[in-house]
């Protein structure tokens, strides 16, 4: 049951295809030059509560999401869509949390931007449907998991579901989802693949991130079309590279930080044929990476 919130306007809409695939309308008609400037907005860990005045760790989560939405809208017409990478809700994923979340992101949809969601450990599969009311096809291609593919011109985005137990820290993909991912990657070798999931890779004996990280890399590493892996969960901004050459990007939280040396904020992504450019929009304006471009070249 992929969770996609279509744009309200007719400027851009989504074509829902079989098997959890979503195509951005008009992407196939983009010229190579237009594809070079394909931009996306990435949010993670918004942790919105039903009460817009709710605070955690000294932060009003609703106000932070509102701030991120306004900044993203200021980017103009070049943005193709928005991804929210899990932990959309505050704690246990109540339906009322998602109702508030929907209201906060509605200006994006009003402006013509579709919004694509993944689930984190503070989300709830049933309640997200109740709270969002309109979130795409309810059919599942992997039992009890939300998976989907967003097909852009410059890259395909593979959205995974790492939610194992609500309000329990670690995450899990599971064998069925890994098999789905392998199959869908093998069917799409014509353009770069970007994988997105909520939980961070974690190979510790007692992981707090993704429990089946090693199995995920067995799928991703040998498939050369896979160029980048985005995740959140740790409320940390880092850009690293796996030994396979796949770029690993830990998205900052829109909500709050666990470490005061870190920043919250959001990330702007610009795709090209052989590279991706990241720009961090930090809420801490004095943060070292704020506003700076990081150019990541695709592995060959």
What residues fall within each predicted segment?
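N-terminal secretory signal peptides and thylakoid transit peptides that target proteins
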Residues: 2-25
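Short acidic, glycine-rich surface-loop motifs adjacent to enzyme active sites
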Residues: 188-204
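Histidine-centered catalytic micro-motifs
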Residues: 196-200, 227-237
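A short C-terminal boundary segment appended to hydrolase-like catalytic domains
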Residues: 34, 267-300
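N-terminal active-site segment of His-dependent metallophosphoesterases
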Residues: 32-98
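Extended active-site neighborhood of metal-dependent phosphoesterases/phosphodiesterases
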Residues: 94-183, 187-188, 192, 212-225, ...
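Active-site glycine-centered loops adjacent to acidic/histidine catalytic or metal-binding residues
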Residues: 45, 86-87, 120-121, 198, ...
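Short, solvent-exposed loop/turn elements at domain surfaces
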Residues: 48-54, 166-167, 257-259, 288-289
